[in-house]
Amino acid sequence: MNVLLVSTSDIEGGAARATYRLLQGLRQNQVQTQMLVQKKCSGDTAVVGVRATSGMHQASVGLRLTLDQLPLKRYPQREPGSFSPQWLPDRTIAQIKQLNPDVVNLHWVNNGYLQIESLAALAKPIVWTLHDMWAFTGGCHYSQECDRYTHSCGTCPQLASSRQADLSQRIWQRKRKAWQKLNLTIVTPSQWLADCARKSSLFKDCRIKCIPNGIDTSVYRPIDRHVARDILKLPQDKYLLLSGSLGGIMDKRKGFHFLQPALQEISQSEWGDQLELVVFGQSQPSHPPNLGLKTHYLGSLGDDYSLALLYSAVDIFVAPSVQDNLPNTVMESIACGTPCIAFHIGGFPDMIEHQHNGYLAQAFNIKDLIDGIIWILSDQERYQKLAEHARAKAVKEYALSILASHYHQVFTQVLNG
């Protein structure tokens, strides 16, 4: 069996990293696998694509994204967030034909990489792993409160459009026309995304299977907290909360508008002197937001070992997103034995078992988010149990060998008709 994974990048971004882990898992399970990308950031010979160090190619990739976004110029009042028309012709199908795989496993193929119409020219069995909602919407990657993807989109709230025949409906129509005869098998990492796909007008008749992303649990593992903090120069005498980049302040989906007031309120409580915040994914901004707590900005951590060290150094990972699939950050955290707190939405309930290995706050309830943080920290014996359960779940459900086995079964079924 010869498998080809197709992704915009190999290790740049959460979806790319999840795909690259699948590549590693399949190859470790002796499945002949390559990964075709628009932007190659690793030195892995199993990844086919031009290295990101090529200045001319970098410029070409940037130009494709800029051109892909041109139709959005007609919607100057649109909300911040990703929206992908995917209208540019591409050479991807020719590259796939040259590699001649038995089965093609699409992943995140946006940023102008793969044209919607190109899929119709793929004369290969296609398994499409969804990392967000884009494949079955009119262009948005997360629909927020909108359910127009269950019909034909149009009057798109993210475009601030009042017209039914807007860009979102045209993109939806392009997908329906191009994909209606394709024999697609859909894989989603979370049950929530599987349910959304089943409700969608585009994928309601497809085979849909849920397979969680995987993680190398020999790399993401608990490391002595004292040692981890010493290496990262973090305080030994404080409880540390971890959050991802605050660069999504303008993107309401990231939930900063819930995190900020929660931390500010905690800072005014008896816990205020005991807690500090750690932020990774960005350096300290010139005008940092007022979060109430002393904040350590660690910048981007580019390798798995540094990330494992970070998760092991903190007490809780806080994920305040209002809509999300199966974020790598939560999986990485629990693999390191660090409990997580998130709202009871999206794919979080797949990973976080309430008061067993973490805490699921009532959706968008700031008080419950605060209560959850305090509940996790206030009993050391209970905390130890949460940490043990978190690690056990990651090993049992998310190890790369398990991921590869599930995908191998799907590929075999697809090839056997």
Where are these regions (language model features)?
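Short alpha-helical donor nucleotide-sugar binding micro-motif in glycosyltransferases
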Residues: 309-314
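Nucleotide-activated donor-binding/catalytic signature segment of Leloir-type glycosyltransferases, i.e.
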Residues: 274, 281-305
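Aromatic "clamp/platform" in nucleotide-sugar-dependent glycosyltransferases that forms part
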Residues: 322
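Conserved donor-binding/catalytic core segment of Leloir-type glycosyltransferases
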Residues: 235-254, 260-263
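Short hydrophobic beta-strand element within catalytic cores of glycosyltransferases
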Residues: 339-342, 352
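A short, well-ordered alpha-helix in the C-terminal region of glycosyltransferases
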Residues: 368, 375, 382-397, 403-409
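A short, active-site helix/loop in glycosyltransferases that binds the activated sugar's phosphate group
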Residues: 137-142, 162-210, 215-225
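Conserved acidic donor-binding segment of nucleotide-sugar-dependent glycosyltransferases
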Residues: 354-355, 359-366, 375-380
